[in-house]
Amino acid sequence: MKKVTAMLFSMAVGLNAVSMAAKAKASEEQETDVLLIGGGIMSATLGTYLRELEPEWSMTMVERLEGVAQESSNGWNNAGTGHSALMELNYTPQNADGSISIEKAVAINEAFQISRQFWAHQVERGVLRTPRSFINTVPHMSFVWGEDNVNFLRARYAALQQSSLFRGMRYSEDHAQIKEWAPLVMEGRDPQQKVAATRTEIGTDVNYGEITRQLIASLQKKSNFSLQLSSEVRALKRNDDNTWTVTVADLKNGTAQNIRAKFVFIGAGGAALKLLQESGIPEAKDYAGFPVGGQFLVSENPDVVNHHLAKVYGKASVGAPPMSVPHIDTRVLDGKRVVLFGPFATFSTKFLKNGSLWDLMSSTTTSNVMPMMHVGLDNFDLVKYLVSQVMLSEEDRFEALKEYYPQAKKEDWRLWQAGQRVQIIKRDAEKGGVLRLGTEVVSDQQGTIAALLGASPGASTAAPIMLNLLEKVFGDRVSSPQWQATLKATVPSYGRKLNGDVAATERELQYTSEVLGLKYDKPQAADSTPKPQLKPQPVQKEVADIAL
């Protein structure tokens, strides 16, 4: 009995010692100018901007996993597309009169040009090294079949020729020509099937995880930057002087630490919503989140991989979210080429791939539960789509693959679970709540804390998104001559549009292609195509979009 008592006493003393140590460490405040929560591409990009703009500012980055770029930024957890609307048909919706709207496509392409310029500038500075390790030329193609879809692609191609950003795009309805562009897609296909494709040679495959690792490695070279891994944010508290005290737990030894920061950026991917709520700022009350995961079929068989060099995007089926469009992609991951097909939607209540099953429940509050319910009731087609995706069998997924690769063999493919994407649900005065595709910077009125919510187009537009954050939070500094000069050196087209300016578009594409080692040939005249038949579209209930 005495031994048991002694053992229990020693355990109690030990636990008390750990608790006291945690409290002692928490009382030792670390001070920093900027706290970056999350070790992904958004925090890395913002940190890189600030390092150039204010080199004397101290920065601390905290990441809950054992390394950076292990969640959504990881190359295996996303599609790796340099989203520039060259092939993504959801960015060019069809109007009621049958015409094609290109405004969204132009905006997406403009944004990606900023990312290209930002990365090229970092290569010239020596921050990013060996461009082929993170970006490679992979042609972007749209591919459709069936009379209506072919007519849509004709109209899309014609509409995009109005923009200087889409010059150089090719169009064909010829089986032989399309087979030359994408052999996998055409071999074994019915020669009588009506098909059409567009192809743009300057498309890219991007490893966002590698970009993240290199950016953070460069930040670490400065003594006023600190990276803390296996460190999870447990609390955020605003101080009277508008600084923030953030409690961070060391997941390895159980201790805690307080970090006092003048500015906090929450770039924690799916976890950003919960941390934003934890901050208590009133702006957070308008938001909720709904997690959707994605799976891909992967082939590493050389017979498949060496027979396909393109990203080929199709058109979403009727009743499916426009962004759910399937695609068969060349990827360059871990230094080698692979082919991915998907995505297939999955459901988990986790907000991160390495998150908790309680994430969805714990983010639901009295202020956002009604917007969530309204979104669910107003988007029954989306709910049906997600249920149908979750119920897919191995055979179902393989049949979907064969629509894009008729001669596919099951033994060449394996299923891979990619990352989680938390869709934004925002309070809406008219509808109660709406599902928002895209990303959104949410900040307090004082500009002391900001979070990035949303999932698409995500990493490919990290550079323009963080520019938007700088303008929103550091408006006075952004307008200063010093910051203006630095930003224009970092992003040469900053403050102006490339669309409509052929010379400027070609100049920036030539510059970034040379620095990043990408293919770029001066665009030739547009292909002649059959005139599209613009037919009025039947009135259909709009399907809410989601990012997979």
Swiss-Prot record:
Xref: PANTHER family: L-2-HYDROXYGLUTARATE DEHYDROGENASE, MITOCHONDRIAL
Superkingdom per UniProt: Bacteria
Record-given protein name: Probable malate:quinone oxidoreductase
Keyword Isomerase listed: no
Family matches, as HAMAP family: MQO
Annotated stretches, region: Disordered: 521-548
Family membership: Belongs to the MQO family.
Substrates-to-products reaction catalysed: (S)-malate + a quinone = a quinol + oxaloacetate
Keyword annotations of the record: FAD, Flavoprotein, Oxidoreductase, Tricarboxylic acid cycle
GO biological process, alphabetically ordered: tricarboxylic acid cycle
Pathway in which the depicted protein is active: Carbohydrate metabolism; tricarboxylic acid cycle; oxaloacetate from (S)-malate (quinone route): step 1/1
Coiled coil: none
Species: Escherichia coli (strain SMS-3-5 / SECEC)
Gene name tied to this protein: mqo
Biased composition (Low complexity): 530-541
Taxonomic classification: Bacteria, Pseudomonadati, Pseudomonadota, Gammaproteobacteria, Enterobacterales
